[in-house]
């Protein structure tokens, strides 16, 4: 789970700053020299682990993500097509399964851009 979250965040930060301050990404120690449980893209016997799935999720061509440093919801378009009228919806429930927040917006997304959708009002 740790590998999944770490690498998903690495790629989501890259998406969030798409073409602004980031234009590439370097993964250090992607090949493990000996068996390990963290910071590797695959195991010493070439089996995929959480890194593969976290990276794949973050690198979806069309991806919605929460940016924890700014508390914004972003729509990422990593395709060569424009997508007008993309609807982004967020719902938050408490532990008693009561909906405590709901918001929906419609945004236009140009090719290869990240669009700030809204800031959720987290209670």
Predicted regions mapped to residue ranges:
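Substrate-binding clefts and catalytic carboxylate motifs of secreted carbohydrate-active enzymes
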Residues: 1-84
